Amino acid sequence: MKTPILSLAALLSVMAAVPAAAKTKVELKDAQGKAVGTIMLWAEKSGVGLQLHLHDLPPGEHAIHFHQNPKCDPPDFKSAGGHFNPAGKKHGFENPDGHHNGDMRNFTVDANGKADGKLEDKDVSLGDGANSLFSNGGTAIIVHAKADDYKTDPSGNSGDRIACGVVTK
């Protein structure tokens, strides 16, 4: 009877040593402080997955980026700083020298002001290290007024910052 109990104890101690899948939920607010939805972030094998549940946004294509500071002071959200860029690269997926870690693909808001969908960023993490969205106290997620052109430095001509949420543990 001791062997099964010891085996169970060993299994439980190994399971306790394995970290739970990292995830966090971010609430986004507009420039007036009104909640416009949430984004769930979770660790993937390579990078971070995002599930968008947004509402009350202008219809059309919008840029979304991770920004370097865990601040979202309205009305312009400039307190979030520039794009999260620990690798020190230029902006845009079409840049031959690489892109910011915080650059992501555009997403579409429907005619009713809603956006529900998945995105990913393979150049960030929810773990430890320089690419962690939790480094230096966290980061911010910014939704921009326009689409990212994926090439123009520093932000892809993506327009004003219209929604912001702080990413922390």
Where are these regions (language model features)?
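Bacterial N-terminal signal peptides
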Residues: 7-15
